[in-house]
Amino acid sequence: MKKLLAMFFCLSVVVSAPLAMAEDAKTTEKTTDVVLIGGGIMSSTLGVYLQELQPDWSIDMVERMDNVAEESSNGWNNAGTGHSAFMELNYTPDNPDGPINISKALEITEAFEISRQFWSYQVKNGVLNNPHAFINSVPHISFVWGDENTAFLKHRYDAMQHSTLYRGMEFSDDPNTIKEWVPLVMEGRDPAQKIAATRMPIGTDVNYGEITRQLVSAMKTKSNFALHLNSEVRDIKRNADNTWSVTYADLKNGEKESVIKAKFVFIGAGGAALKLLQKSGIPEADLYGGFPVGGEFLVTENPEIVKRHMAKVYGKASVGAPPMSVPHLDTRIFDGKPVLLFGPFATFSSKFLKNGSLWDLIGSVTFSNVMPMTHVGLDNFDLVKYLVSQVMMDDDDRFASLQEYFPNAKKEDWRLTVAGQRVQVIKKDDDKGGVLKLGTEIVSSQDGSIAALLGASPGASTAAPIMLSLLEKVFKDKVATPEWQSKLKEIVPSYGQKLDGNIEMTNKIRSYTSSTLGLDYIEVKPE
């Protein structure tokens, strides 16, 4: 018996030694006020807000890639649209029995006006430089064909004219007028085809990667900010004092682990946010699951083609298609050089990030979310059918889709590029078991000490208002103080007000942001 106990003791020591050594390797690197997980547009926007509102707070940003803005915020990994609902038809669903509801469109438009104000403030204060490096005026155009779709577009246009935010939008079903707007879309098209389009001159193309890089660069100038690159978060645990310990591995240094203790943690890690939120153990995380959808685009850099198209042209999504899958032919501007993108074409991978793991989807399935995910799969057959049809597309199919928007396109001018991954949010629902949430959602603990952003569209273009909502949710008492109120109104002059219906305020804000960012401006006039 003694020999057996001795053997057991020795075995315990042998097994425990590496674990003890591993624990020793986890050195509490520091204590900080805020940890931002992920180096994308969301974390950088929140970080800049906090540096303005509470400059004495220390902030650490942890990013697994070797630079910031390398995942979803990277310019090539998203459509680069300044989502204002000027052309995105999915924000104004058809209603054959009555007037079209534009409430969601108004919400999106108001949100982007906040982003424009946030960026303008950063330009004025030297945080962002050279606005044309990250935002440019590109007209936003909706283009449809067929009796049903053209009638819908006219009804949509009529409904939107009741809002002051859409004054300046033009509607046409005249082929010659539309050809002036987008010649490539019209050349080679069947003259008998019934078509219609709307055009909003004050649309934008945005490089969110450039914004992110500039925001983080400015944050790095502050002594109480630290950026940890090549650092992958492995665990998030609540401490007895309600602070959080964030464990991360240094991917360039033998995966040595370090721990940062923080009072507040924001998980802005794109597709990885769900799994990291689950690691935190907060009960709110149990309500959510996720399903990844990837994207590909056809690209041309042929200058003879590119110079003849200066617009973002959005069509109508297929039945059951997620918002990110609305087909569009876009002018994009990278480092001052325009290119054309067409897509996206949905792809499937079980990765939650472009540079993620094939085990991401399986690893996110828990006892709490397996049934909601199953219900969503069963209740959204149109979406499943759409994704299958997209995955089955070959080069000829993709090119045929392009020719619906650019009839004279030639295959040799275009190449296929892989964009980023998006994780569509699935939320537990008492009535349906589970529902697919197609927007973005802030999830936070009851005490507001940890929060995550889940979801996809409209995403980056509304980073400023989304992070403003997060501040109001998790720092409610701080936001109510005169100091924070004053600073927020300085950053976002329209803070707390709606622009819709307020012509004077709309003109004041749009004139200010247009002049600061170097964008086209249309004065809103009374009817």
UniProtKB/Swiss-Prot annotation:
The keyword Flavoprotein applies. Belongs to the MQO family. The keyword Flavoprotein applies. It catalyses: (S)-malate + a quinone = a quinol + oxaloacetate. This is Probable malate:quinone oxidoreductase. Pathway: Carbohydrate metabolism; tricarboxylic acid cycle; oxaloacetate from (S)-malate (quinone route): step 1/1. Signal peptide: none annotated. GO terms for biological process: tricarboxylic acid cycle. Its EC number is 1.1.5.4. Keywords: FAD, Flavoprotein, Oxidoreductase, Tricarboxylic acid cycle. InterPro entries: FAD/NAD-bd_sf, MQO. Its cofactor is FAD. GO terms for molecular function: 2-hydroxyglutarate dehydrogenase activity; L-malate dehydrogenase (quinone) activity. SUPFAM superfamilies: FAD/NAD(P)-binding domain. HAMAP family: MQO.
